[in-house]
């Protein structure tokens, strides 16, 4: 089974992430940031990842450290769960619509962290959630999972719909990329022989 648990403790946050990449989408989420919980639920359900996230952070200041550190810890957990990356498909992509919004996410488990984030949000906040924190979440994930990630919101008017399509597409792209390829069993998906 491809499971992992990672704990991250700093002076700003205490985070625990437990996941099963071959799950069914079950989740138990308690980050202290309700909108982040809603987005993590999209990753679990659409990525078919069993996901537990518990976070305690300095949200009395703002949600920045909690959101970023959850991204970091999730990236570490995914990297730990897939190990040497043998047999994975490596690449994944997804387009997801929600009413007027449409987003595309493309991921490569290349071992080279890189983020292209192009979401022209129509407002700065979704409820109390600062939309800029979504970039920090994905940057943290990318840097610690060792992936290249391209996120594009192709259209949208409602900022909630824009971000929800991003997280749903991310979950689906993640699922596709970490899926085991029977034809490449035991092989590193790279001509270099390593990722």
Swiss-Prot record:
Pathway: Amino-acid biosynthesis; L-histidine biosynthesis; L-histidine from 5-phospho-alpha-D-ribose 1-diphosphate: step 6/9
GO CC term, one of those recorded: cytoplasm
Enzyme class: lyase
Catalytic activity: D-erythro-1-(imidazol-4-yl)glycerol 3-phosphate = 3-(imidazol-4-yl)-2-oxopropyl phosphate + H2O
Protein name: Imidazoleglycerol-phosphate dehydratase
UniProt KW keywords: Amino-acid biosynthesis, Cytoplasm, Histidine biosynthesis, Lyase
Gene that encodes it: hisB
NCBIfam families: PRK00951.1-1 (NF002106), PRK00951.1-5 (NF002109), PRK00951.2-1 (NF002111), PRK00951.2-4 (NF002114)
Location(s) in or outside the cell: Cytoplasm
Family designation: Belongs to the imidazoleglycerol-phosphate dehydratase family.
Any single GO BP term: L-histidine biosynthetic process
């Amino acid at each position: 089974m491809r499971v992992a648990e990672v704990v991250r403790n700093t002076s700003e946050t205490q985070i625990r992430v437990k996941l099963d990449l071959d799950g069914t989408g079950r989740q138990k989420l308690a980050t202290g940031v309700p909108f982040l919980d809603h987005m993590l639920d999209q990753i679990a359900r659409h990525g078919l990842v069993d996901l537990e996230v518990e976070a305690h952070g300095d949200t009395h200041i703002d949600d920045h450290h909690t959101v970023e550190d959850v991204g970091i810890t999730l990236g570490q957990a995914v990297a730990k769960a897939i190990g040497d990356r043998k047999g994975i498909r490596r690449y994944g992509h997804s387009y997801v619509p929600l009413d007027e919004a449409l987003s595309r996410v493309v991921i490569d488990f290349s071992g080279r962290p890189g983020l292209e984030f192009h979401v022209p949000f129509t407002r700065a906040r979704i409820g109390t959630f600062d939309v800029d924190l979504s970039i920090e979440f994905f940057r943290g994930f990318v840097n610690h999972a060792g992936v290249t990630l391209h996120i594009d919101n192709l259209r949208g008017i409602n900022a909630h719909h824009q971000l929800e399509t991003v997280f749903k597409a991310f979950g689906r792209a993640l699922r596709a990329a970490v899926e085991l390829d029977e034809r490449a069993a035991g092989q590193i998906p790279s001509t270099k022989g390593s990722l």
